[in-house]
Curated annotation (Swiss-Prot):
Region (Disordered): 286-311
Biased composition (Basic and acidic residues): 292-303
Database matches in InterPro entries: Cell_Proc_Reg/RNA_Proc, FHA_dom, SMAD_FHA_dom_sf
SMART domains: FHA
Domain FHA: 28-78
Protein name as it appears in the record: FHA domain-containing protein At4g14490
Amino acid sequence: MVTPSLRLVFVKGPREGDALDYKPGSTIRVGRIVRGNEIAIKDAGISTKHLRIESDSGNWVIQDLGSSNGTLLNSNALDPETSVNLGDGDVIKLGEYTSILVNFVIDDFQEKKLTRNNRRQANARKRIRVLESINLGDITEEEKGLDVKFENKPSSRVRKVRKIEDSEKLGITDGLQEDLVEKNGSFRNVESIQSSSVNLIKVEMEDCAMVEENLGRGLKKRVSSKATRSKKIEESVGKACLGVVNVEKVETLKEKRITRATRSKKIDIVGDSYLELDMVLNRARKNKGKNKKADQKPLKSFENDEVTDSGEQGLSCHVEEDMNNELDTDLRKMTLGALFSFLEGHLSKEIIHKTENMIEPMRSKTQRVREYISDQRKVQAKACMC
């Protein structure tokens, strides 16, 4: 038995005229406030959690939740915490003014759906029986040299459509149409089946034609490749007989076969090292040109400047001479290890040279400051003596 839906109609009270529907399996709590309740009624005699209505084993049940003023069902007081079955037409009274009428609504929507589906299935079965009753032989069609066979297998939908097309070709569609019209009462099904079958057969024939063209192209490619190979072999044999074969081509082929990936990698590395050498040479030449320009510039001379650190000047001159001598060496004849060792010494000396050039003006300034201070002290001492 199907559980009916519940409809609560408010006959009296603050919500008079309202009607609420609830499906089976739902739980309805009634109280004075909205929080925790599905139905809120602003009545002074209703508790915050007054009663509960729910569906239990195919029946709707009401239960009082220990309210202060109690609940009446058909003028009978309900015991708290005990459930009572509801019936169609029962009246629930709670609070000072509120009364609710209970109605059961049976939903026939599902039953209607089932009957419709059953009718559709019955019509489909009738059509299948009509199609199975027609026994046709295997029909073959030849198009572009291909054999296309239509076999009678009623298990698949496409084969049934093919049967209808075959029956049209043999002139049997009249009887089939009459049977379908007698059972269905309209020509729509026959027309739709015919159009779908024609479209399916056209698509299949086009696919077959495409397959045939692709096969032909593949065969042509294979035949042409074989012919070219044979021609190449014949030409090479003829040239060898006449003594016209190029020796250079044979040597290059042998070299390509002998060489391996490791050797090619080594060649690439050597090329990169030569590039690095060229870059280093260019940098060394630029630095040499800069040093020459710096030497050619006139230095500011001071009459009273006297450099006391003669040992440091000797070091700087020695470093410059060593740098010039080392730059004159031919870097292209060096190995990679010798180049790295040369760069280590050369870069360190170049750094020392640059720092000396930066420190030298600072030393001259400090010397002049010291001389100035000593002169001032001498002047002050003479003034004090006077």
